[in-house]
Amino acid sequence: MEGSDFLLAGVLFLFAAVAAVPLASRLGIGAVLGYLLAGIAIGPWGLGFISDVDEILHFSELGVVFLMFIIGLELNPSKLWQLRRSIFGVGAAQVLLSAALLAGLLMLTDFAWQAAVVGGIGLAMSSTAMALQLMREKGMNRSESGQLGFSVLLFQDLAVIPALALVPLLAGSADEHFDWMKVGMKVLAFVGMLIGGRYLLRPVFRFIAASGVREVFTAATLLLVLGSALFMDALGLSMALGTFIAGVLLAESEYRHELETAIDPFKGLLLGLFFISVGMSLNLGVLYTHLLWVVISVVVLVAVKILVLYLLARLYGVRSSERMQFAGVLSQGGEFAFVLFSTASSQRLFQGDQMALLLVTVTLSMMTTPLLMKLVDKWLSRQFNGPEEEDEKPWVNDDKPQVIVVGFGRFGQVIGRLLMANKMRITVLERDISAVNLMRKYGYKVYYGDATQVDLLRSAGAEAAESIVITCNEPEDTMKLVEICQQHFPHLHILARARGRVEAHELLQAGVTQFSRETFSSALELGRKTLVTLGMHPHQAQRAQLHFRRLDMRMLRELIPMHADTVQISRAREARRELEEIFQREMQQERRQLDGWDEFE
């Protein structure tokens, strides 16, 4: 692809994403499906703006690479060791069982047994990019089903190595083309990467961080991710596996959060590019000429994988409410199928349109997953949001709550317990199935689902409630929910959690005046105690705390129109001088009155 063509392709990708994804979100079908539909629209079988799909698809795998690096940063080696049973137990069983069943079915459709084996293995793999994206959207990351799903995906990445090595053996060309010496050298190189990364990465990043130049740190992070991906690709291994290992090696370093911040913008954009590329690769010509075969294949593929995954989840002891989430999110074919089937085609394992049919099946199965997960959500909503069972004794028996609490993590739990201790009628909305199960055991009235859905808010009693307390983890969800409440339930008093100063500005701009910055009050309290330990009288320290709080809130309100402007810097300096003057005056006025005060804790 020429430089100008590459630039044009980039503009088209960005335009497709900007146009399709907001529309898809508005229609309620999700960003992933929006990317896929955008890819179909601009690809060779749509408007035909881009024809070189294979090259772009290979480049777009960098989105998966960046995602796996961030996941590696979140998992230290000890946590990875704890997952060994689910990785090598459930993960291995899923690949072997799914591959065996799917290979058997392919043999019934005139595939040679060698081609059927390769096809079964390729179809048994799931899409790492899509599954992880959907797990994050559904709040599954910390749930039992989410952890098990990640373990299965990790084993699938490990299975790439033997799967690719198996292709020349099945093609009967092992003696001519399969060099065991090269395999040994690749294994040694891989081990060398592990050892080198273990002892070299932290000193290198310590040296780079000492320069104090943020851009250099970002460049070094990109070099690490792209370099490890290129190294693994040269070895014929999974690029995503290489960057995942690099992330794990740095998971316990002091640079973990800085690395994640540097990578995050690239991850999101490249993941979108990957999904658009998958949509572009959909061969509508093959779909048109073999429509019945493809439709049946997609249904059978998804059904077989759901069956295998559901049974394994049951054997592993996953709660019944989480099994369908686990099975549904991994039910599609994956990006590895494109690599494996291309390798098999070069070895002449496939005949006629067999490879094209398999790739169309994989692509369409990926498009069904967001829709399938919406159906799973509706099913779970009916299961959990129906009438209470007779043997349950919830805290709230009235269907008209006074308060709706959205999100019941550590922040929301404190609020909920305080309200319930004072006999307030509350209803909780939570999208983490594990949390829903736990709360119901303790008698909380809780609804499962996405609180940004108006119907769920109505069924939870929003039309009769007096207040709503929003404690979402994601700022985007908070702002979306504020907008929905103001539009559909204007009578509600909105109280919200702000993760930081920027979100506090956004809430004020949206008209929400009752909010709490999650670390501000606790930091102020600890600061007051620090002043006392440094010799300040407890009463004086309390007054200092109150003055600081008032001045900070005043600054927050004054700077709403320019919260992204450099004017904040000079205003902050003025506020600090003003605060110092207030403290000095009060210290002089109150010095005589402090002798009768004791520590008030």
UniProtKB/Swiss-Prot annotation:
Name of the molecule in the record: Glutathione-regulated potassium-efflux system protein KefB
Function (record text): Pore-forming subunit of a potassium efflux system that confers protection against electrophiles. Catalyzes K(+)/H(+) antiport.
Transmembrane segments annotated in the record for this chain: 4-24, 29-49, 55-75, 87-107, 115-135, 152-172, 177-197, 207-227, 230-250, 268-288, 291-311, 324-344, 356-376
Quaternary structure and partners: Interacts with the regulatory subunit KefG.
Entry-linked SUPFAM superfamilies: NAD(P)-binding Rossmann-fold domains (SSF51735)
Gene that this polypeptide is encoded by: kefB
Superkingdom as given in the UniProt entry: Bacteria
Gene Ontology molecular function: any one: glutathione-regulated potassium exporter activity
Topological type in the membrane: Multi-pass membrane protein
Origin species: Escherichia coli (strain K12)
Entry's family note: Belongs to the monovalent cation:proton antiporter 2 (CPA2) transporter (TC 2.A.37) family. KefB subfamily.
Stated regulation of activity: Activated by adducts between glutathione and electrophiles.
Domain RCK N-terminal, chain residue ranges per copy: 400-519
Keywords: Antiport, Cell inner membrane, Cell membrane, Ion transport, Membrane, Potassium, Potassium transport, Transmembrane, Transmembrane helix, Transport
Chief subcellular location: membrane
Subcellular location(s) per record: Cell inner membrane
GO cellular component terms attached to this protein's record: plasma membrane; potassium:proton antiporter complex
Pfam families for this protein: Na_H_Exchanger, TrkA_N
Membrane recorded as keyword: yes
Gene Ontology BP terms: potassium ion transport; proton transmembrane transport; regulation of intracellular pH
NCBIfam families assigned: 2a37 (TIGR00932), PRK03659.1 (NF002973)
